[in-house]
């Protein structure tokens, strides 16, 4: 596991102490300059971290340390839907986000760069109506509201999505 925050790594050690083995390492590092050899990893997973580094540097570092035929999986927020942009801006005004993070939030342009770099790339979009899921679940139950949300994810344009998942395979 890597993180730029030593405190975050300590929290992970505590939360997952029952699952740790000697092969699991915790390394404090910057994702823009990973301290690993070229072609070192078969799989890299990133959850919500793309907006915390220079997009171009992060893309190149992930590609560099991933083995040929290795897989990069990321889940993150998409910064295209105006509702979510306003929400993120309100968090910025409250001091919960930095301006640089807002500028680096993943968008379609960044997703195209990943697709171009990796070649073999699957992108799944979801959460177009996530903002209504909780209130709706109070009336029709979580399972039914989730079905409606999934249906709209398939019907609505991708720019309305809240989240995306990339599954990219490195092919030299």
Over which residues does each language-model region extend?
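Local beta-strand N-terminus motif with an aromatic residue
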Residues: 41-42
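Class I SAM-dependent methyltransferase SAM/SAH-binding core
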Residues: 1-33
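A short glycine-rich, Lys/Arg-flanked "PGG" loop and its adjoining helix->strand segment in the class I
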Residues: 56-71
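A C-terminal cap/extension of S-adenosyl-L-methionine-dependent methyltransferases
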Residues: 87, 91, 122-172
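Short catalytic micro-motifs in class I SAM-dependent methyltransferases
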Residues: 48-49, 57
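Conserved class I S-adenosyl-L-methionine
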Residues: 73-96
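Short alpha-helix
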Residues: 101-123
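A conserved beta-strand element that flanks and buttresses the S-adenosyl-L-methionine
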Residues: 45
């Amino acid at each position: 596991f890597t993180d730029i925050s030593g405190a975050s790594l300590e929290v992970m050690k505590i939360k997952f102490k029952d699952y740790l083995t000697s092969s699991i390492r915790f390394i404090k590092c910057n994702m823009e300059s990973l301290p690993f050899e070229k072609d070192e990893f078969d799989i890299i997973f990133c959850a919500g971290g793309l907006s915390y580094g220079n997009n171009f540097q992060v893309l190149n570092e992930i590609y560099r340390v991933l083995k040929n035929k290795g897989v990069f999986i990321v889940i993150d927020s998409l910064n295209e839907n105006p509702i979510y942009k306003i929400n993120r801006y309100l968090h910025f005004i409250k001091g919960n986000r930095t301006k640089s993070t807002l500028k680096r939030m993943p968008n379609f342009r960044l997703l195209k760069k990943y697709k171009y770099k990796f070649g073999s790339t699957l992108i799944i979009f979801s959460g177009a109506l996530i903002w209504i899921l909780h209130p709706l679940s109070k009336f029709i139950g979580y399972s039914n509201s989730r079905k409606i949300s999934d249906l709209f994810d398939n019907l609505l344009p991708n720019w309305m999505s809240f989240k995306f998942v990339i599954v990219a395979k490195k092919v030299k």
